[in-house]
């Protein structure tokens, strides 16, 4: 079957923004103008097409990136038909992993900013991710009709906060209630959209009288930016002082693809103005799959590349798993090279397992359309893959390749969950297993000490939504505990010649076990060590492992507060036995008694987990962030510039002090700082902390 749309007319784009910039509304308008939606879904009435999980419609925020395919021929039908694969990405900081994941499979992105709020914190995080993956991008300043809307302030914020190089290709006509349309700086004409047709129709007009000088000034900046794309263009511009429309678009395109500039547009998605011109800019200025470097990977341990061509062997990256109530698991994948048809067998090269692709569907938000094949550059979902996890490679069986893996952050918050009823127990295990497969930043484990199920994620909202999804999608009701800290106990000095004697000789078969031990600290991270130093057979060989076993049984229950004991060395130095009454159990008990007594004498202490915390913050909040970390008993270990005009602070902070940190950090920095943390090591808890912990366990 021949390709319907040539690959150079594909645009795989993400739409990315801070929570309230109006991204979902913008996506809705795109679907409307490109002819997919007949009735525009508004977010405020919970009808948006892309936000299809129930929680999203209730909360009015986007949690899962849905992928949608649509087509565009231009506002004036001036282009051949182009195919857009649009990935809608979440804007909440707890879902950053979703954004990171979609950045891997996009070729270009549209960053949506609010004309009032401007560049907000998550915009900075998303910008960093797009820079990391070298994603070319456009900026769309939305909500131009709102009180306080100011396009040029957003241009300035992009320069200062993001260190970006924004180049407006339109300027607004009016603002707030007076926002009427835009001046297209390429054509130097005003574009006014017709409200009666919901913006489907428009007309070009003359630039309003007071705007000519502003438009002229920004046009010159745009033409200069385009001229810098090549020596040829620069020479022509210097000689003639002007470039043709084709040359300007060509120059801007080259520099956008190299991530040197970010063309800017504006409008109001809600009032149906401006999105249409932005779609034209996606065709003119963002890359097709063949305009970006070919995907790289490993073939037999050697670096390999796969060009975006139907002739190359098939390779694809699974970037998202979703459960569909009707067809089961959907595996979203981006095909980088080759062709795959439904019914084909492919290789999951990460697990070295073959999988059969059952059916292939292309998604429009929550609707599915079955297709027969997927070609290089396309995005679709497969039904029927058994054992594929996010970030794994699917490829031709005879041409294995592992595409670069995605990196996911370690979860930073843990809570215990318990099913409300016995019936929920088994269902909860299945539900959590499925959710963990879908979302690599969410983990599940069983705590060996308490036997509880512990779930970990990227933030409090993340875990709330997981618990919510268990209830809605799997019908599992769960109680959620308060976040917990895993303390430990150890000793701080060496004690020698500690006796443990278990004697019971009052008629009948007696019991006799006697050992003498030395207990010493073994150093951080060394764990438990046992040395047999018995000489002259004072304890027979067969009883020595029993002493060790008795001590190990006691390790799980320290003498201060019942926490596990770590990093101790036991030397068995002396003892005695009875020919008839000695037994393995008697020596186990003797070992346990000796160890408990030795612990008491060896100055035991409580250890708490210390976390390596890294905070990225704009410079103006530096003082607040540092002050807050030291209030949390944190030790600042270094500071760097983050390359975006902000600072990176590295500190070591006890886990016990980090609960609620994401919320506190967000409010202290108006949400502009982000942080990550991971376990570093155990360290002795200060006396007041240890006393409080011990009191809480009594």
Swiss-Prot record:
Pfam family, one: EFG_IV
Residue ranges of domain tr-type G in the record: 8-290
Disulfide bonds: none
GO molecular function: GTP binding; GTPase activity; guanosine tetraphosphate binding; translation elongation factor activity
GO cellular component, one term: cytoplasm
Residues reported in the UniProt entry to bind GTP: 17-24, 88-92, 142-145
Any Gene Ontology biological process: ribosome disassembly
Function recorded in the entry: Catalyzes the GTP-dependent ribosomal translocation step during translation elongation. During this step, the ribosome changes from the pre-translocational (PRE) to the post-translocational (POST) state as the newly formed A-site-bound peptidyl-tRNA and P-site-bound deacylated tRNA move to the P and E sites, respectively. Catalyzes the coordinated movement of the two tRNA molecules, the mRNA and conformational changes in the ribosome.
NCBIfam families cross-referenced by the UniProt entry: EF-G, PRK12740.1-5, small_GTP
Record-stated family: Belongs to the TRAFAC class translation factor GTPase superfamily. Classic translation factor GTPase family. EF-G/EF-2 subfamily.
Protein name, per record: Elongation factor G
Native source organism of the sequence: Laribacter hongkongensis (strain HLHK9)
């Amino acid at each position: 079957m021949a390709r319907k749309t040539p690959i150079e007319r594909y645009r795989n784009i993400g739409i990315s923004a801070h929570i309230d910039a109006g991204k979902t509304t913008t996506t809705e308008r795109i679907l409307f103008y490109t002819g997919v939606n007949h009735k525009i879904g508004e977010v405020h009435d919970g009808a948006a097409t892309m936000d299809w999980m129930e929680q999203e419609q209730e909360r009015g925020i986007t949690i899962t990136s849905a992928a949608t395919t649509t087509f565009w021929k231009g506002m004036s039908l001036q282009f051949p038909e182009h195919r857009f694969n649009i990935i809608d990405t979440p804007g909440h900081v707890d879902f950053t992993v979703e954004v990171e994941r979609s950045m891997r499979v996009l070729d270009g992105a549209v960053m949506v900013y609010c004309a009032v709020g401007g560049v907000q914190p998550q915009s900075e995080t998303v910008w960093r991710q797009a820079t990391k993956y070298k994603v070319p991008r456009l900026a769309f300043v939305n909500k131009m009709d709102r009180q306080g809307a100011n396009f040029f302030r957003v241009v300035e914020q992009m320069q200062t906060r993001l260190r970006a190089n924004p180049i407006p290709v339109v300027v607004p006509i009016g603002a707030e209630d007076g926002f009427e349309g835009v001046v297209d700086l390429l054509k130097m004409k005003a574009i006014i959209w017709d409200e009666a047709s919901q913006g489907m129709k428009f007309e070009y007009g003359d630039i309003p009288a007071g705007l000519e000088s502003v438009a002229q000034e920004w046009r010159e900046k745009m033409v200069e930016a385009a001229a810098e794309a090549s020596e040829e263009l620069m020479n022509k511009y210097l000689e003639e002082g002007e470039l043709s429309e084709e040359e300007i678009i060509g120059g801007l395109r080259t520099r956008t693809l190299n991530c040197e500039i970010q063309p800017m547009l504006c409008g109001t998605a809600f009032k149906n103005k401006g999105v249409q011109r932005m779609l034209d800019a996606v065709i003119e200025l963002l890359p097709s799959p063949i305009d970006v470097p070919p995907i790289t990977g490993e073939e037999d341990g050697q670096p390999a590349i796969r060009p975006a061509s139907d002739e190359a062997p098939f390779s694809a990256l699974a970037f998202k798993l979703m459960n569909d109530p009707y067809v089961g698991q959907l595996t979203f994948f981006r095909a980088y090279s080759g062709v795959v048809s439904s019914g084909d067998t492919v290789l999951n090269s990460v697990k070295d397992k073959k999988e059969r692709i059952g059916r292939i569907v292309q998604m429009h938000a929550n609707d599915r359309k079955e297709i027969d094949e997927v070609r290089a550059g396309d995005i679709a979902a497969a039904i029927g893959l058994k054992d594929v996890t996010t970030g794994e490679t699917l490829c031709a069986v005879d041409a294995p390749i592992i595409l670069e893996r995605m990196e996911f952050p370690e979860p930073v918050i843990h809570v215990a969950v318990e099913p409300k009823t016995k019936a929920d127990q088994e269902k909860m295990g299945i539900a959590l297993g499925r959710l963990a497969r879908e979302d690599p930043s969410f983990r599940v484990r069983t705590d060996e000490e308490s036997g509880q199920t512990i779930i970990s994620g990227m933030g409090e909202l993340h875990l709330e939504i997981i618990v919510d999804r268990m209830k809605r999608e799997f019908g599992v009701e769960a109680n959620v505990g308060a976040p917990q800290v895993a303390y430990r106990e150890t000793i701080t000095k060496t004690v020698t010649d500690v006796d443990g004697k278990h004697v019971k000789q009052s008629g009948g078969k007696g019991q006799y076990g006697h050992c003498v031990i030395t207990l010493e600290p073994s150093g951080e991270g060394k764990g438990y060590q046992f040395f047999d130093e018995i000489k002259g057979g004072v304890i027979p060989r067969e009883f020595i492992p029993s002493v060790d076993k008795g001590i190990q049984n006691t390790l799980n229950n320290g003498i201060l507060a019942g926490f596990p004991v770590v990093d101790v060395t036991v030397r068995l130095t002396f003892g005695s036995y009875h020919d008839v009454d000695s037994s393995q159990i008697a020596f186990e008990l003797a070992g346990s008694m000796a160890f408990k007594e030795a612990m008491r004498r060896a100055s035991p202490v409580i250890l708490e987990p210390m976390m390596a915390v890294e905070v990225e913050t704009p410079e103006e909040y530096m003082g607040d962030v540092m002050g807050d970390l030291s209030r949390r008993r944190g030790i600042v270990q270094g500071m760097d510039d983050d390359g975006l005009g902000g600072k990176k602070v590295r500190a070591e902070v006890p886990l016990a002090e980090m609960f609620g940190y994401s919320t506190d950090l967000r409010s202290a920095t108006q949400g502009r700082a982000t942080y990550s943390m991971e376990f570093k090591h155990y360290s002795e808890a200060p006396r007041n902390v240890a006393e409080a912990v011990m009191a809480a366990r009594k």
